[in-house]
Amino acid sequence: MAGRQTGWSQAALLQFLLGMCLTVMPPIQARSLRFVTLLYRHGDRSPVKTYPKDPYQEEKWPQGFGQLTKEGMLQHWELGQALRQRYHGFLNTSYHRQEVYVRSTDFDRTLMSAEANLAGLFPPNEVQHFNPNISWQPIPVHTVPITEDRLLKFPLGPCPRYEQLQNETRQTPEYQNRSIQNAQFLNMVANETGLTNVTLETIWNVYDTLFCEQTHGLLLPPWASPQTVQRLSQLKDFSFLFLFGIHEQVQKARLQGGVLLAQILKNLTLMATTSQFPKLLVYSAHDTTLVALQMALNVYNGKQAPYASCHIFELYQEDNGNFSVEMYFRNDSKKAPWPLILPGCPHRCPLQDFLRLTEPVIPKDWQKECQLANDTADTEVIVALAVCGSILFLLIVLLLTILFRMQAQPPGYHHVADREDHA
């Protein structure tokens, strides 16, 4: 009996202590999503330009060149629906302006893509319907003029240092060899299109035109065989690498994609230290925007981002209170977003590690880093000369003032103090 009583007392004591611990210790918080940033490309569009011998000129396209098509609108509406499903329980099912902020480049196709996306993401509820026959509500999309956009329109410029890096890239063996290997092919394309300047850097225009025409069921010219179009596609992908890589990728990133990445990291850090809105920040932009960002992150797959593709940043608060970042890339509407792994970090990357690993591509002063070394030195010399000139000018003014006052004193007797005056 005594042994049983002792065992019972120990069990009761353990239960009592466990109850006390649960009372004193705060409950463990489950891992939770705190903030999402999206960067997506616009949807299907008409060609941005064409070539002189193209039988399909601008009047062939209902809204002209570079405009979002009905297919593009549907692509983004479907992406909005997919995002609505992915973030069910995180975002409100109806639009709340405090939760969402959308910024777009100032192009019709990106603005309209954002609007179509929001229509899929936030269909109006009963209270938000302004017309019972219209299942849509206006949601603001913010932008700045193209000439002032230093966040989403790439490549950023003017930037003399970046142009210098591009000139150096043209001298690399990879670029030179690619030019030699494709010289005859580029000449053929120039002859068939009527273009006078077809290079590795401009060939994407030809591919883009043919791709858009083929996508919309237009008959391609005989010279644009499947093999030719495939080769054009490969050179188009090379032109993206030329913009942001091949040579001095980190330096290029500091002047290009690192600018956007810096803003994204700033937002992630802010959301980890405050509980402010919004929950969702959206950027509507271009394939070059996605390439610039992904090259800065060193996660680019070497292929042009398809229409309505979407790079996702998700900020989580772990059960221990720390924060982590996960990235995904949705480049196929029929598949789940593909996990992206920042080199040197697991997919669930601690926020502090994410910041540390990306620091080399974050510019400290973009304007200053864009200047050439000689320009910086010349500026310093000019400033020094300006300072010296100002000092010399002040000395001359002071000297002239003294001389003027001396000459202004009237002639006659002047008292001269002797020693007794200072006794």
From Swiss-Prot:
The membrane-bound form is converted to the soluble form by sequential proteolytic processing. First, the C-terminal cytoplasmic tail is removed. Cleavage by a lysosomal protease releases the soluble form in the lysosome lumen. The gene is Acp2. InterPro entries: Acid_Pase_AS, His_Pase_clade-2, His_PPase_superfam, Histidine_acid_phosphatase. It is found in: Lysosome membrane; Lysosome lumen. Glycans are attached at N92, N133, N167, N177, N191, N197, N267, N322, N331, N374. Keywords: Disulfide bond, Glycoprotein, Hydrolase, Lysosome, Membrane, Signal, Transmembrane, Transmembrane helix. GO terms for biological process: lysosome organization; skeletal system development. Disulfide bonds join C159-C370, C212-C310, C345-C349. Residues 1-30 form the signal peptide. GO terms for molecular function: acid phosphatase activity. It catalyses: a phosphate monoester + H2O = an alcohol + phosphate. GO terms for cellular component: lysosomal lumen; lysosomal membrane; lysosome. This is Lysosomal acid phosphatase. It is a single-pass membrane protein. The lineage of its organism: Eukaryota, Metazoa, Chordata, Craniata, Vertebrata. Residues 403-423 are cytoplasmic. It comes from the Eukaryota. Belongs to the histidine acid phosphatase family. Its EC number is 3.1.3.2. The chain crosses the membrane at residues 382-402. PANTHER family: ACID PHOSPHATASE-RELATED (PTHR11567), LYSOSOMAL ACID PHOSPHATASE (PTHR11567:SF180). Residues 31-381 are lumenal. It is an enzyme of class 3 (hydrolase). The active site is at H42, D287.
